[in-house]
Amino acid sequence: MSRVSTAPSGKPTAAHALLSRLRDHGVGKVFGVVGREAASILFDEVEGIDFVLTRHEFTAGVAADVLARITGRPQACWATLGPGMTNLSTGIATSVLDRSPVIALAAQSESHDIFPNDTHQCLDSVAIVAPMSKYAVELQRPHEITDLVDSAVNAAMTEPVGPSFISLPVDLLGSSEGIDTTVPNPPANTPAKPVGVVADGWQKAADQAAALLAEAKHPVLVVGAAAIRSGAVPAIRALAERLNIPVITTYIAKGVLPVGHELNYGAVTGYMDGILNFPALQTMFAPVDLVLTVGYDYAEDLRPSMWQKGIEKKTVRISPTVNPIPRVYRPDVDVVTDVLAFVEHFETATASFGAKQRHDIEPLRARIAEFLADPETYEDGMRVHQVIDSMNTVMEEAAEPGEGTIVSDIGFFRHYGVLFARADQPFGFLTSAGCSSFGYGIPAAIGAQMARPDQPTFLIAGDGGFHSNSSDLETIARLNLPIVTVVVNNDTNGLIELYQNIGHHRSHDPAVKFGGVDFVALAEANGVDATRATNREELLAALRKGAELGRPFLIEVPVNYDFQPGGFGALSI
């Protein structure tokens, strides 16, 4: 039952005003870990907004990030002062580079005792967070909290979307000065979708792009997450289908076209040539003469050098932000506007155009299919492509058409996920594309399952990243989230071992090798049912059991990697 937090005077406090305004903006959950500010805020002051206790503040930040990403609405996370805030800061960094509208909140020392680096647990929170946020401020007077929340939301929902931060001195949080709950809050006016820059004359630039398309023989659309945030996916699909233009995506934009669509040319990772032992980037881009980057974001790690294969190309940039990277990407035409507005205009501008001739990538598709069908039984552990193929199979069985989410933590296996994991809806494949935050998997799966409670969520994580944040297995169990987790275990930081071999032609075990962890026992100790699988048959059976269980389930899979360091020439070191 909700109640109004009151000061000793019996009047409502800033804590109530804070939660009330967050709720006005559509925030339904606050993920976090509470400290001594619990004397000022209980988090039951307002109905319709729930506190979700996590074991680590990083989990709180990433869970809010993913819930915000999928819903398109700002979400909130909380930390106590000092080390709580610094723990949360990696979640904040994740949301700034991964582009999610997160409202990060942290307690601060009493307003009369804020002496950073001298007062117990007192750090200059705003100075720490400001460089990696859209907006960072400290509350000075209790009655200003509503305005600060409004400013935080507006900044977070401005492209490129990202986190806003409010530091809350505990005495002001518990103060009633100027707080009047008898007066209704003004309308929140939360943006319906992120707000970007609209350049004067963008329509003329769009028409120039259409003229380039008219001359092109083999164009492609390279689509990033800003296109999804704009609500442009159906329009992009219609445009691509009408003009027969292939669609290539960044990691996080997988699912713009569903698996199996003839125009879905896949997602790009710089590791793909090495993983496949095949000239994948050359196959995807060499014949292309026009690249239209639609909602493209350099942070999503599809670098211009990757599409600059083969013949000389013209480029068109369509983005709701001014180009931040002219040194590495200088397009022939730059259209700065809302992505959906551009696609709608472009439909009219190209209405008389005939279908284009798609370039052939069948050799690449055949190579990917060969990996997914790999029937071998390996004595030293399954191969990651076999694991992902099994996950794809059971996801297709368990999910309704166009549904389901595969979450990937960070590691070498993540790039197998980019290549091989199915994604039948926007944000159907989730990973930390911008920040690559180690340990992302568990909190991202929590956020995804909460955003899509009626859809299955599968998580793939390596032993390194998973165990760096495995304490929040208990959070999954406590919330009874039916997440099916697959831990691919080689007792190694496998991606770092790859880089050792690329740079030195050998590995150095003390820097990458771990002692063994019994992840089945670890899961069970946290209240999660678990098993171990060593081959396809066992893994498929375990995945099907997990998908039908209706509660959390973990599968540990011993794996090994086969790689030739010389095949990873597309990587920048």
From Swiss-Prot:
It comes from the Bacteria. Binds 1 Mg(2+) ion per subunit. The keyword rRNA processing does not apply. GO terms for biological process: isoleucine biosynthetic process; L-valine biosynthetic process. Thiamine diphosphate binds at residues 410-413, 436-438, 464-465, 490-495, 561. It catalyses: D-glyceraldehyde 3-phosphate + L-arginine = N(2)-(2-carboxyethyl)-L-arginine + phosphate + H(+). Pfam families: TPP_enzyme_C, TPP_enzyme_M, TPP_enzyme_N. GO terms for molecular function: acetolactate synthase activity; flavin adenine dinucleotide binding; magnesium ion binding; N2-(2-carboxyethyl)arginine synthase activity; thiamine pyrophosphate binding. Its cofactor is Mg(2+); thiamine diphosphate. Keywords: Magnesium, Metal-binding, Thiamine pyrophosphate, Transferase. Substrate binds at Y271, D301, R414, H415, L571. PROSITE patterns: TPP_ENZYMES (PS00187). InterPro entries: DHS-like_NAD/FAD-binding_dom, THDP-binding, Thiamin_PyroP_enz_cen_dom, Thiamin_PyroP_enz_TPP-bd_dom, TPP-bd_CS, TPP_enz, TPP_enzyme_TPP-bd. Mg(2+) binds at D463, N490, T492. GO terms for cellular component: acetolactate synthase complex. Its EC number is 2.5.1.66. Belongs to the TPP enzyme family. Homotetramer; dimer of dimers. Involved in the biosynthesis of the beta-lactamase inhibitor, clavulanic acid. Catalyzes the thiamine diphosphate (ThDP) dependent condensation of D-glyceraldehyde-3-phosphate (D-G3P) with L-arginine to yield the beta-amino acid, N2-(2-carboxyethyl)arginine (CEA) via a beta-elimination resulting in the formation of an enol which undergoes a second elimination to generate the alpha,beta-unsaturated acryloyl-ThDP. This is N(2)-(2-carboxyethyl)arginine synthase. It comes from Streptomyces clavuligerus. The gene is ceaS.
